[in-house]
């Protein structure tokens, strides 16, 4: 369990005295060094005092001393500056490529740390560290949530950067793709992104002033003007629907004009979705947003407050869709405007990461700070992750908090990365009395 031994060394979760080398010399750990997760020794620039002499250099850690030879460190000059070899089992004496014998010290993982770690790995409950959450200092919780919030934004920034590259350096196009993806609200997110990438913005831009043409362009590219891909209950009605026929005819003209090829309409998911989340409705809402010039990054950058962002993203549908969710099937009249919670989700998943990523790209710290300000201005999301943490004593107050908890679950809890988690650290270092009180 070498990884756990690394952890014990890094966080000094071991008795500080008495420590000795395998040949009986006293050891004092002054500084454990900087953890290296890449090639080379495990810890750089450590400081250890051996028999009263201070040594500054690298520390290498293994389960068994013989792993030194298994890993070829005796032939690698990068390990010549190792000032201490820390092992669980000292089964051999090791040598560097220069023939030197670095001091070696046996260090065991404390039983309580090992037991607590096994508890975390074996736990079926989420979060596995729930027993200590309510007793954690507020500073510990706040600092970790702040770090997780930034980590999540960094992760989303990478995804946006990939979209910018795929869009040949166009931030406006990347914003449209990001916005479209989040119009899928999870279930159809991947398909919305695929669809958005198929939209030649330069071409549809020629028809931006005509909302009917934009609808035809968007729905046609989505493959939804082919009645065969629509839910069975509306296929026959769609073919007889005048509006559907007009859209299909208009898209045929646009497809010839711009050599368009739609995506596979069978990819869209309608089953078990609420009608307001049907891709037909979401695409028409986005068409209106685009028609009104509110789907551009420049407009987002101009927003100075949460209220302005909400106004930018608020949208509805055209008259036909006020009485339809699917082609040919009438329903009770509704403007089908975004709910406040939907606008909040779009703000969290689109506006915030785009402002942060674009701010990084432009070297504009104000945009980056604005992204964090938006998260702090929004209430925490309501989902099962946030609710689970509330039940164990950690209540999310803002969207920044809820985003941090989502990051915590997906990047740490689900992957059992307890050794990289500050809550996991608190669990591991606690005594059994602390853990059970």
Task: Put a short name on every predicted segment.
Residues 7-66, 79:
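N-terminal ordered "arm"
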Residues 30-32, 41-46, 66-71, 88-92, ...:
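Short alpha-helical segments and helix-capping/turn motifs at coil-helix boundaries
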Residues 148-404, 417:
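Hydrophobic, aromatic-lined core segments that form the binding pocket/scaffold
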Residues 1-7:
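N-terminal "leader" segments that precede or initiate the main folded domain
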Residues 80-82, 86-144:
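Compact, glycine/acidic-enriched structural inserts
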Residues 65-67, 90-92, 111-113, 185, ...:
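Short loop/turn segments at secondary-structure transitions that flank enzyme active sites
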Residues 44, 54-55, 60, 66-80, ...:
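N-terminal accessory interaction module
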Residues 391-437:
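Acidic, carboxylate-rich catalytic segments that either coordinate divalent cations
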């Amino acid at each position: 369990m070498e990884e756990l031994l690394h952890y014990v060394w890094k966080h000094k979760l071991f008795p500080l005295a008495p420590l000795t080398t395998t040949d009986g010399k006293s050891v004092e750990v002054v500084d454990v060094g900087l953890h290296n997760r890449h090639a080379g020794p495990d810890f750089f620039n450590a400081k250890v005092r051996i028999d009263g002499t201070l040594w500054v250099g690298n520390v290498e850690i293994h389960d068994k001393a013989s792993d030194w030879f298994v890993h070829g460190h005796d032939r690698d000059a990068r390990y010549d500056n190792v000032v201490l070899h820390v092992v669980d089992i000292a089964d051999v004496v090791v040598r560097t490529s220069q023939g030197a014998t670095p001091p070696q010290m046996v260090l065991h993982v404390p039983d309580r740390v090992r037991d607590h770690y096994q508890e975390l790995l074996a736990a079926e409950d989420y979060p596995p560290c729930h027993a200590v959450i309510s007793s954690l200092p507020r500073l510990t919780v706040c600092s970790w949530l702040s770090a997780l919030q930034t980590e999540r934004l960094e992760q989303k920034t990478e995804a946006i950067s990939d979209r910018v590259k795929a869009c040949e350096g166009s931030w406006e196009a990347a914003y449209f793709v990001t916005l479209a993806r989040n119009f899928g609200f999870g279930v159809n997110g991947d398909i919305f992104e695929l669809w958005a990438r198929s939209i030649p913005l330069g071409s549809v831009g020629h028809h931006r002033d005509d909302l009917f043409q934009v609808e035809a362009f968007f729905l046609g590219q989505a493959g939804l003007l082919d009645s065969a891909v629509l839910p069975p209950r509306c296929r026959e009605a769609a073919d007889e629907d005048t509006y559907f026929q007009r859209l299909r005819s208009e898209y045929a003209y646009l497809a010839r004009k711009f050599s368009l090829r739609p995506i596979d309409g069978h990819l869209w998911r309608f089953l078990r979705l609420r009608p307001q989340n049907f891709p037909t409705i979401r695409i028409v809402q986005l068409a209106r947003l685009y028609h009104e010039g509110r789907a551009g990054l420049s407009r987002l950058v101009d927003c100075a407050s949460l209220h302005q962002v909400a106004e930018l993203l608020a949208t509805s549908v055209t008259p036909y869709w006020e009485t339809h969710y699917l082609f040919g099937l009438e329903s009770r009249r509704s403007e089908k405007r975004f709910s406040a919670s939907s606008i909040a989700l779009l703000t969290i998943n689109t506006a915030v990461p785009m402002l942060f990523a674009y701010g990084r790209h432009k070297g504009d710290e104000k945009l980056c700070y604005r992204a964090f300000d938006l998260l702090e201005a929004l209430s925490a999301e309501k989902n099962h992750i946030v609710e689970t943490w509330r039940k164990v004593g950690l209540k999310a107050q803002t969207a920044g908090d809820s985003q941090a908890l989502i990051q915590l679950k997906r990047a740490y809890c689900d992957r059992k990365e307890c050794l990289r988690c500050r809550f996991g650290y608190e669990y591991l270092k606690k005594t059994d009395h602390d853990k059970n009180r």
